[in-house]
């Protein structure tokens, strides 16, 4: 390959600001960010690939809205891509997104507008009811990871996402952030030997030291037992994916 790049697919409220900080600290002005229209899918990845090619001096890229794609699309152009992706307990991710977006008083995208005008339960219900907003609160990780096999029409999203998980050279876990940084450093140093992945926390809504069970209890008390059950049901596939990544970290993959 003529070129190796790092691409942070910045999944909202999955420690992405910390990852961007690390990339910028390592690469300075060779780290770039940009956002895209999520749909149509093929137009999105066309624009993402064009961006990568046009930013010929850049080494590290980051975007909330770049869709995941088959790496061979870049390899044909002589570019090797190392995707950087983090996953998180799906219910906690949605809860963090809600509290973060409530504070965005000058932003008028759907998420912040909804969050500022309703409680957490209402936030979930409204986003579920709006076409192309529902993925934000229902199987978000599966939706995003399945993009790697977007063209496989005979496969279910969870099946695609689990295959993507196996193909990715790196997958981070917010709940194991320090271990994730070690793994990221090992992965990137194969191509950039001086790379350092320091452990930092930014845009934190709740204490990172709060036990997961305690955070889930807070959410359950906030929305009630019945709605919490619904939250779990509409994120059932995301839970399967998250638990798979948890197991990978337990096994020291």
Swiss-Prot record:
Keywords: Signal. Residues 1-15 form the signal peptide. GO terms for molecular function: sulfotransferase activity. One of its GO terms (cellular component) is membrane. The keyword Signal applies. This is Uncharacterized protein AF_0307. It comes from Archaeoglobus fulgidus (strain ATCC 49558 / DSM 4304 / JCM 9628 / NBRC 100126 / VC-16). The lineage of its organism: Archaea, Methanobacteriati, Methanobacteriota, Archaeoglobi, Archaeoglobales.
């Amino acid at each position: 390959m003529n070129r190796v790049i790092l691409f942070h697919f910045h999944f909202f409220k999955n420690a992405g600001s910390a990852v961007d900080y690390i990339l910028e600290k390592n690469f300075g002005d060779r780290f770039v960010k940009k956002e895209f229209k999520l749909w149509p899918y093929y137009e999105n990845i066309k624009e993402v690939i064009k961006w990568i090619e046009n930013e010929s001096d850049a080494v590290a890229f980051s975007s909330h809205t770049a869709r995941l794609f088959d790496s061979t699309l870049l390899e044909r152009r002589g570019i090797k891509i190392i995707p950087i992706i983090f996953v998180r307990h799906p219910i906690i991710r949605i809860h963090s997104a809600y509290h973060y977006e409530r504070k965005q008083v000058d932003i008028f995208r759907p998420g912040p507008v909804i969050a500022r005008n309703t409680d957490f339960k209402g936030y979930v219900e409204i986003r579920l009811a709006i076409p192309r907003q529902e993925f934000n609160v229902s199987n978000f990780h599966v939706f995003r990871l399945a993009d790697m096999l977007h063209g496989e029409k005979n496969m279910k999203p969870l099946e695609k996402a689990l295959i993507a998980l196996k193909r990715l050279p790196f997958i981070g876990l917010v709940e194991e952030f320090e271990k994730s940084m070690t793994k990221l450093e090992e992965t990137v140093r194969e191509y950039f030997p001086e790379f350092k992945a320091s452990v930092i926390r930014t845009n934190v809504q709740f204490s990172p030291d709060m036990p997961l069970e305690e955070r889930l209890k807070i959410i359950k008390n906030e929305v009630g037992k019945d709605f919490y059950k619904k939250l779990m049901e509409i994120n059932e596939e995301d839970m399967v994916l998250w638990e798979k990544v948890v197991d990978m970290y337990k096994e020291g993959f």
